[in-house]
Amino acid sequence: MDPDSTLPPLVPGTLYLVATPIGNLEDITLRALRVLRECDVVAAEDTRRSGQLLRYFDISKPLLSYFQFNEARRSEEIIERLRRGEKVALVTDAGSPGISDPGERVVKAAIAAGLRVESVPGASALVAALTASGLSTEEFHFVGFLPHKSGQRRKQLETLRAVPGTLVFYESPYRIDKLLGELNEVLPERQIVLARELTKKFEEYLRGTASELLTLLKSRTLKGEFVVMVAPAAA
């Protein structure tokens, strides 16, 4: 029996938030592939990158750019498409739309307009890193990317010192040294786990205090975005 034959068809006028692989293409879900095949249009953070993903799975769909600097205008267009009964799939470069990526604005607009929104879950750097970190997963606080300005970053880190549970950040390879330096000043005693290249050939976890990790990174040049996890304060 074809498993798709037992599944309900996509609903017209629905915004589908489709999670895409964070590195390993085998992590895409069967449901994600079905939605991408059956939708009317794919709104993508980077149409070139998403186009490559669609071609890999032999899917041909119109692509609509949706990113940080055009999301206000594009959100209005997507809402109009939904009102006409179109089925719109929203994807980002990797992971779930709206999680440290564009998506929140159009979701809020769709809900405010009384339109249907469905999540199509899948790969998540946050979950992948946290579950393999060895740190407490009973309670955690997802921060995402800190502000770029040093004063704002420091203020937020000072506030987070009192937050219970594991802290989870995203950071680029260009600012990882800066973040570790700030953590060394604000949370010097905490254990930290750096996760990089998740689901890829060179997936790696680095563990230690901020000071220890700074010393380690001096001898290495690391690429790819990091998930930075900070252990809770010792009881």
Language model features with spans:
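Glycine/small-residue-rich loop that forms an oxyanion/phosphate-binding "nest" at active or ligand-binding sites
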Residues: F67-N70, S75-S124
